[in-house]
Amino acid sequence: RPLRVWQNPKITDDIYLHFSEILRGVKGYANKIHGTVLDIGAGKMPYRKFFKYDKYISLENHKYPGIDITADVTKKIPLKNESIDSIVCFQVLEHINEPQNAINEMHRVLKKNGVCLLTTHMAAPLHGLPHDYYRFTPFAFKHLFRKFKSVEIKTQGGAVLSIMQLIVWGISEKLPKIISSPLIVILNIIGKKLDKIIYSPVFTINYSVFAIK
C-alpha cells in the first residue's frame, strides 16, 4: 500500500475502515513513543512522522531501501540488552512464524520502563503469502507479552465496522470498479457511523497492544 493510504486513508479507499482505525490508534499513543525508537518490520516507516524521538532505527528481515538493520527478529536483534526506549511494530506480527521469540527479543532490547506499541490483525483476508501465519486474540497477547509489567490491549474497530470492511474487500475484489467504487464509499460511511452507535468489541478487525517493560 502507498504511504498516503497509511497516513491519510480516504473514504474512497477499499481499506479505509481498517486503516483509519489503525491510524487513530497510532496517533492516540504517539506521545508515549520517545528516545531511541526501533521500528520492527519498518517497511516505508509510514507512522514515523507522528513520533518525537532522539534516534529512529528501522529493521526488516530482508534488504529494503532506507533500512538500518536487516535481521530475523525470531533469532536475534543485533542490539545490546536494554538499549532501546521504544519499539513500534505495525501489521507485522501475523507474518512472523515464531511470534513468542520475536516478543522475547523485543523485551530483551528494551530498557526498563521502555514501551512497545504493536498492531496486528484479528480478522483479515490472506495476504503477504506465503508468510501469513496468525490471527490474534487478547488472550494471545496476554500470553505473548507476559514478561512485560503492563499490557494494554484495544480493539481497532468494533464488530459492525469490521464486518463491513470484510464486505468492502469482497466487493473490491469481485466487482468491476465502476460498480464497486460508489458501493465502497456508501459502505465505508455506514460502517463508520453504525460502529459508533452500536459498537461491540466481541469481534474486531485489528488490535493495538501497548506494553511497558
What are the functions of these language-model segments?
Residues R1-E82, S86-F90, I103, P201-Y207:
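Conserved N-terminal segment of class I S-adenosyl-L-methionine
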Residues F90-L93, T119:
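Residues lining the SAM
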Residues E60, I212-K213:
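Residue-level signal for short segments within beta-strands and strand-turn junctions
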Residues R4, T12, N97-N101, E105, ...:
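S-adenosyl-L-methionine-dependent methyltransferase catalytic module, highlighting the catalytic core
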Residues V88, I96-N97:
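Short, solvent-exposed loop/edge-beta patches enriched in aromatic
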